[in-house]
């Protein structure tokens, strides 16, 4: 018979008391919201970033009785992104992690063959879905913990032409490449202990995926 061990509460994720910036919550079906619930259950302090006051207000009930910490920032607006640093400093925020779950593509006219994609649509998708990761990291570099973990949500099919996903495939491929370049630049210029990773999810039923034709 083994020697009985005293009960020990495990903290597998080791997130208790950590401050995490969560982006990309659109509604309860968002991947970002599912991740946020796990983070909260693990004891993390969550700060939610929304694109607009209207989107924030729409989700306040979901976040819990209006007590959630939130900020508004449209990542297409350079002035708003630049304003994140003084906002974080004013609120004494040091982020142990960032969840980047921001993506957009204009499929209002359906999925076109890739060679027919409109330049403005492609560049907008690249700005929102890819460049925003670098922009957020740069804006908040002084507000990151020395061992901060930055995670972005990608897809599992950037190496194949999934036609129903349209031009977001190349955009997500650019996001994957940005991850390794960000890891290199942040560890050399900000802190050698910062980590940057991408999670390539398989197809999931979300409000975002509902907008993908086919």
Task: Kindly label every feature range from the protein language model.
Residues 63-79:
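Rossmann-fold cofactor-recognition segment
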Residues 65, 212-214:
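A short C-terminal helix-loop "cap" of Rossmann-like NAD(P)-dependent dehydrogenase/epimerase domains
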Residues 76-91:
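Conserved Rossmann-fold cofactor-binding substructure of NAD(P)-dependent oxidoreductases
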Residues 19, 45, 94, 149, ...:
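Structural signature of beta-strand start/N-cap positions in the alpha/beta core
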Residues 12-47:
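Canonical Rossmann dinucleotide-binding motif of NAD(H)/NADP(H)-dependent dehydrogenases/reductases
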Residues 24-33, 103-142, 146-192, 200-206:
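Catalytic loop of short-chain dehydrogenase/reductase
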Residues 19-23, 95-103:
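Conserved hydrophobic beta-strands of the Rossmann-like cofactor-binding core
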Residues 42-58:
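Conserved glycine-rich Rossmann-like NAD(P)H-binding loop of the short-chain dehydrogenase/reductase
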């Amino acid at each position: 018979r083994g020697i009985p061990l005293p009960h020990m509460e495990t903290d597998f994720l080791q997130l208790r008391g950590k401050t995490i910036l969560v982006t990309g919550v659109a509604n309860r079906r968002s991947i970002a919201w599912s991740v946020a619930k796990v983070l909260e259950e693990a004891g993390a302090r969550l700060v939610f970033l929304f694109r607009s006051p209207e989107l924030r207000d729409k989700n306040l009930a979901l976040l819990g009785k209006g007590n959630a910490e939130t900020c508004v920032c449209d990542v297409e607006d350079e002035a708003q992104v630049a304003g994140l640093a003084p906002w974080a400093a004013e609120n004494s925020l040091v982020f142990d992690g960032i969840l980047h779950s921001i993506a957009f593509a204009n499929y209002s006219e359906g999925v076109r063959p890739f060679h027919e994609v409109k330049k403005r649509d492609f560049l907008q998708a690249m700005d929102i879905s890819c460049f925003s990761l670098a922009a957020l990291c740069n804006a908040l570099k002084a507000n990151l913990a020395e061992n901060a973990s930055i995670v972005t949500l990608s897809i599992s099919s950037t190496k194949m032409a999934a036609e129903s996903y349209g031009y977001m495939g190349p955009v997500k491929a650019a996001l994957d490449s940005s991850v390794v370049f960000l890891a290199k630049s942040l560890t050399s210029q900000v802190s050698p202990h910062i980590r940057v990773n991408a999670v390539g999810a398989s197809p999931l039923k979300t409000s975002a995926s509902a907008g993908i034709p086919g």
